[in-house]
């Protein structure tokens, strides 16, 4: 490892630890559940009414996803069950201990029309505000910019916590990834002391358990189980690509379908964590890779996913499971070849293939997009292993990996922001019955 990377070692490790964390349930509704749980701690009795206001992008990512343990979709049930049974100290695992009684009480609040959800007029791409009323008491909690970043707590109109301006503008936890290149990420992952990155094994443990749950039970669109059945009836072969698709898709099915198991997330998203983890797990098993090589590949995958996502808005109209799959495809290329050129060629070909995939909100159909992304990754990896790739003469892809990634992310930051608004407009206007 070169000297400059050694100097940044602690920052890189801290950034990956910050971005790769367990999360129970899709993180947008869970963010609202967390705000409600925090608000409840400032009331002397259970809330009688809850009002939720969120940014358009958060609304988009919460309309169609099942809240774990409830069997219901949307922000209303997330807020109600968070207020009644959520753990205010558990972050993205705030719903880990909810009971059947909590869920029943939350559903009664919805039946009594005691929970309202509306769009907030805010400049924040990511914003959630939950106001709880119990008798004469009112508690209000605001989360902004990231899923657990509480910026304001009020009780009865008086501020009892406000994140200081200095803290609100504190250094971006992934800022280190703006100082380095993809080649630096590769060099770091393949040479850093193994014990310092061993923690990434938990991603394989958690997301593999989620995958097995998705293969045992019908969740969401149960794509993983459907494809598995088609191996049994001869319509699909039991090859490496289909094993990657089935095991990764099943984890996403369970994640989006409300399984009460945590995913190891990446950049605030369980699906991104799944897309960055499961292909590596399956390929490492296929190749009978050593523990060290598997750990390094997992770290490389997650670090590349963070590296690309650091150039994107927190939420956008670009499907970020796709960019996370670029990390895992690159890591799988390394497992096969141990060459950075194969990693680079794989990612460039993916950018030339599926970079236009839109995000139209978190939903069961995310599993299909995860599968499409990792299928592109597998094709691109095989091309790279055969020393071919989408070239710099084609579309937004350039000869250089860094410039190709920057071009993709520029689309998401700029022109696709207009696409995002139209997606939100369509989603909030369509009939839901």
Curated annotation (Swiss-Prot):
Transmembrane segments: none
Top-rank lineage group of the source organism: Bacteria
GO terms for MF: L-cysteine desulfhydrase activity
A Pfam family matched in the record: SDH_alpha
Biological-process GO terms, alphabetical: L-cysteine catabolic process to pyruvate
Entry's family note: Belongs to the UPF0597 family.
Protein name: UPF0597 protein DNO_0106
């Amino acid at each position: 490892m070169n000297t400059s990377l050694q100097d940044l070692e602690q920052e890189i490790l801290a950034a990956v630890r910050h971005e790769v964390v367990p999360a129970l349930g899709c993180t947008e509704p869970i963010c609202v559940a967390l705000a409600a749980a925090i608000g409840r701690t400032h009331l002397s009795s259970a809330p009688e009414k809850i009002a939720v206001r969120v940014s358009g992008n958060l609304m988009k990512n919460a309309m169609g996803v099942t809240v774990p343990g409830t069997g219901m979709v949307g922000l209303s049930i997330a807020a109600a069950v968070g207020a009644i049974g959520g753990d205010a100290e558990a972050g993205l695992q705030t719903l880990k201990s909810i009971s059947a009684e909590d869920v029943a009480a939350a559903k009664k609040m919805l039946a009594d029309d005691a929970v309202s959800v509306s769009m907030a007029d805010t400049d924040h791409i990511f914003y959630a505000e939950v106001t709880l009323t119990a008798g004469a008491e009112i508690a209000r909690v605001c989360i902004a910019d990231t899923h657990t970043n509480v910026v304001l707590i009020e009780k009865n109109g008086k501020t009892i916590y406000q994140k200081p301006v200095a803290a609100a503008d504190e250094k971006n936890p992934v800022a280190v990834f703006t100082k380095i290149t993809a080649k630096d990420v590769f060099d770091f992952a393949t040479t850093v002391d193994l014990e310092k990155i061993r923690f990434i094994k938990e991603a394989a443990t958690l997301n593999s358990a989620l995958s097995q749950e998705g293969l045992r039970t019908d969740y969401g669109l149960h794509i993983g189980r459907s494809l598995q059945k088609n191996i049994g009836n001869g319509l699909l072969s039991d090859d490496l690509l289909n094993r990657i698709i089935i095991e990764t898709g099943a984890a996403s099915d369970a994640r989006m379908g409300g399984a009460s198991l945590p995913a190891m997330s990446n950049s605030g998203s369980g699906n991104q964590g799944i897309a960055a983890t499961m292909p590596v797990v399956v390929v490492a098993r296929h190749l009978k890779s050593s523990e060290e090589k598997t750990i390094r590949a997992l770290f490389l995958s997650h670090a590349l996913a963070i590296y690309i996502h650091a150039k994107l808005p927190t939420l956008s109209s670009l499907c970020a499971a796709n960019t996370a799959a670029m990390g895992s495809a690159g890591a799988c290329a390394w497992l096969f070849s141990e060459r950075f050129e194969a990693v680079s060629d794989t990612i460039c070909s993916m950018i030339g293939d599926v970079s236009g995939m839109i995000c139209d909100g978190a939903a069961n159909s995310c599993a299909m997009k995860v599968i499409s992304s990792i299928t592109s990754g597998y094709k691109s990896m095989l091309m790279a292993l055969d020393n071919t790739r989408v070239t710099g003469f084609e579309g937004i892809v350039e000869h250089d990996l860094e410039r190709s990634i920057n071009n993709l992310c520029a689309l998401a930051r700029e022109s696709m922001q207009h696409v995002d608004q139209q997606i939100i407009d369509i989603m909030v206007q369509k009939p839901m019955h």
